[in-house]
Amino acid sequence: MFTGCGLFACVRRCDGGDVRKRGEAGAMSSRVAADPAGVEEEGSCKNVAAASARQLAWADVESVTGGFSSRVIGHGGFSTVYLASLSSSRLGAVKVHCSSERLHRAFRQELEVLLSLRHPHIVRLLGYCDERDEGVLVFEYAPNGDLHERLHCSEVAGGVASVLPWARRVAIAFQVAMALEYLHESRHPAVIHGDIKASNVLLDANMNAKLCDFGFAHVGFSATVGCRPSARAVMGSPGYVDPHLIRSGVATKKSDVYSFGVLLLELVTGKEAVCRDTGRRLTAAVGPMLSEGKVADVVDRRLGGEHDGAEAAVMAELAMQCIGDSPGLRPSMADVVRALQEKTSALASAVGSRLDRKMMF
């Protein structure tokens, strides 16, 4: 997910053609039904921030991108990202994604999931457009990028190193845990995120976590590889994927728990899920040391000792439980939330921590 500028809008292409050459005659797809409480009268995209998951016209999407002629600010393997002006003072990013008919169905499934979610630590869907083959999603602003950037690319303006403080790491772990607990325990049927990783955790103006990217989410107790448009949809991301999922081809809530365990290890160690130089997985690199109780040996050295040793031990122990080989022995996300809340004093002083549990709606 691109988070570099303001609101993020994701446009998924289905035919690989030049989006600028498509006129109003583009194929009309059947629209996804939205929650009545979240639908407002269609209008300009300039006011999208005031709405709740508004259904937008394709003309609005073209307007904010200048007919897709605005400055290109990013490229991906299958996408181009355009700078968009949502208002006189608000910028956004429109991602044009080359896809297929099958992936368009996946987009519609993602939209249906997003329309049903409301939690303070899940990125909020502000608007969408499903008029044509292209699908557009507009999300809330996340000015501080994503957790991967903050944890592993820690430079701020002027080139001064900026290490994510320990208390903030604990708060982020707790907030992501609450978001997953909400998906697993408060939604009926449960929602399996399917791709928990540091780059899918956005950080708002107060550095609070917002779980994002539900493109591979599954609704229900479990999902198999065969029922998704691609193996990537179930297999997650390198370094985070549950080995049991690889063996069985079945994603469950405990698959998310495993990925969250890897995220905990990242927060404790400051190291990436997969080493860029060696390709070694973080779980393999630090797992043996943690099994021997050598927590102090793996804590991020950039913290300079400014962390709570007892809290680090709690985080490490939880991480090891989450990445256990047997899914049945892994804790639930409710168990993780409870343990973090009871055993980490950093939560008491971190912004938006304990009170956030009362904000679920």
From Swiss-Prot:
Read off the InterPro entries from this record: Kinase-like_dom_sf (IPR011009), Prot_kinase_dom (IPR000719), Ser/Thr_kinase_AS (IPR008271)
Instruction: Kindly give the CDD domains that the UniProt entry links to this protein.
Output: STKc_IRAK
Q: Name the catalysed reactions.
A: L-seryl-[protein] + ATP = O-phospho-L-seryl-[protein] + ADP + H(+); L-threonyl-[protein] + ATP = O-phospho-L-threonyl-[protein] + ADP + H(+); L-tyrosyl-[protein] + ATP = O-phospho-L-tyrosyl-[protein] + ADP + H(+)
**Which EC class is the enzyme in?**
transferase
Residues carrying lipid (S-palmitoyl cysteine)? C5, C10, C14
| GO molecular-function term, one example from the UniProt record | protein serine kinase activity
Impact after mutating C14A: Abnormal cytoplasmic localization and reduced salt tolerance
The entry's stated outcome for C5A is: Abnormal cytoplasmic localization and reduced salt tolerance
Q: Give residues annotated as binding ATP.
A: I73, G74, H75, G76, G77, F78, S79, T80, V81, K95
Q: What outcome is recorded for mutants in which this gene has been deleted? A: Increased sensitivity to salt (NaCl) stress with increased oxidative attack on membrane lipids and higher intracellular Na(+)/K(+) ratio associated with reduced phosphorylation of CATC.
Indicate yes or no for the key word Protein biosynthesis: no
Known function: Acts probably as a dual specificity protein kinase. Regulates hydrogen peroxide (H(2)O(2)) homeostasis and improves salt tolerance by phosphorylating tyrosine residues of CATC thus activating its catalase activity. Promotes growth at the seedling stage and prevents grain yield loss under salt stress conditions.
**Self-association state and partner proteins as the record states:** Self-interacts. Interacts with CATA, CATB and CATC at the plasma membrane.
Membership in a protein family: Belongs to the protein kinase superfamily. Ser/Thr protein kinase family.
Q: Which PANTHER family match?
A: OS01G0253100 PROTEIN, SALT TOLERANCE RECEPTOR-LIKE CYTOPLASMIC KINASE 1
Protein's name according to its UniProt entry: Salt tolerance receptor-like cytoplasmic kinase 1
- The encoding gene is STRK1
